[in-house]
């Protein structure tokens, strides 16, 4: 189960990174 928890947390981390990159992209245009 720890593997699933890690994957879940990691996907949340990737989502937050993607959101930040998206905001940066919006600001730069």
Curated annotation (Swiss-Prot):
It comes from Didelphis virginiana. The modification Phosphoserine is found at residue 2. The gene is GCG. This is Glucagon. It comes from the Eukaryota. Induction: Produced in the A cells of the islets of Langerhans in response to a drop in blood sugar concentration. Glucagon plays a key role in glucose metabolism and homeostasis. Regulates blood glucose by increasing gluconeogenesis and decreasing glycolysis. Belongs to the glucagon family. It is found in: Secreted. Keywords: Hormone, Phosphoprotein, Secreted.
